[in-house]
From Swiss-Prot:
Keywords: Cell cycle, Cell division, Cytoplasm, DNA-binding
GO BP annotations, alphabetical order: cell division; negative regulation of division septum assembly
Gene: slmA
Matching PANTHER family: ACREF/ENVCD OPERON REPRESSOR-RELATED, ACREF_ENVCD OPERON REPRESSOR-RELATED
Function: Required for nucleoid occlusion (NO) phenomenon, which prevents Z-ring formation and cell division over the nucleoid. Acts as a DNA-associated cell division inhibitor that binds simultaneously chromosomal DNA and FtsZ, and disrupts the assembly of FtsZ polymers. SlmA-DNA-binding sequences (SBS) are dispersed on non-Ter regions of the chromosome, preventing FtsZ polymerization at these regions.
DNA-binding region: 38-57
HAMAP family: NO_factor_SlmA (MF_01839)
Subunit-structure text: Homodimer. Interacts with FtsZ.
A single GO cellular-component term on record: cytoplasm
Protein name per the record: Nucleoid occlusion factor SlmA
UniProt record similarity statement: Belongs to the nucleoid occlusion factor SlmA family.
Family annotation (InterPro entries): DNA-bd_HTH_TetR-type_CS, Homeodomain-like_sf, HTH-type_Tx_Regulator, HTH_TetR, NO_SlmA, SlmA-like_C
Compartment(s) where it occurs, according to its Swiss-Prot or TrEMBL record: Cytoplasm, Nucleoid
């Protein structure tokens, strides 16, 4: 007697969306990460038709937008955890810089998105979304620097300028990683680089 087929439960739209994002970041993390991720390539990796992809996201741009939002949320949680561990502003900033750079090192696909390399053939609005990501990172630094007056009784001459400098430092590390195809170690000279930044907190 033939046993009845057991139907596996269908994944919800949200579960499928998460699966698509996981596969997308996996493709960007791979050795072929610098190659353009077409919907055909993505659909094949997910195991669905191209048409099915658009049941979960209206466009490829929306996939990247969702991925950038996810990156933002993840990194923000890491940053918040890092700054809670330190009492001084200088040590909190140092910990955050280290965390951001380590996140970039461990996630090549993320870094390729944030430097724009993975978005070269995509909708120009995505570049604006990445710019918004860095604006948010700068604002987090501004908030930490402004808290120094309450925590330590000292204020910086220009928190916004210093925050912009710290974000530029992070962006430079991202670009260096991509340029070296992630063969460089951003932590190799981190302590020496921090020794140049530290006097700004004295």
């Amino acid at each position: 007697m033939t046993e009845p087929l057991i139907k596996m439960p269908k994944k919800s739209v949200k579960e499928r969306q998460q699966q698509v994002l996981e596969v997308l970041i996996g493709l960007l993390n791979s050795e072929q990460g610098m190659q353009r991720v077409t919907t055909e390539r993505l659909a094949k990796a997910v195991g669905v038709s191209e048409g099915a992809l658009y049941r979960y996201f209206p466009s490829k741009s929306k996939m990247f937008e969702a991925l950038i939002e996810r990156i933002e949320q993840t990194l923000t949680s890491y940053i918040n955890a890092s700054k809670r561990k330190e009492n001084s502003t200088a040590l909190a900033v140092k910990a955050i810089l280290y965390t951001v750079i380590e996140f970039a090192r461990k996630n090549p696909g993320v870094t390729r998105i944030l430097t724009g390399h993975a978005l070269m053939f995509e909708n120009s609005e995505l570049k604006l979304r990445v710019a918004k990501f860095f604006d948010g990172l700068e604002l987090q630094f501004v908030n930490i620097l402004q808290m120094r007056k309450l925590r330590e009784g000292k204020a910086f001459q220009d928190e916004r300028a210093l925050a912009g400098y710290l974000v530029t430092f992070c962006e430079g590390q991202f670009l260096r990683l991509v340029r070296s195809n992630f063969s460089s170690n951003p932590h190799q000279h981190f302590e020496k680089q921090w020794s140049l930044i530290k006097p700004l907190f004295e």
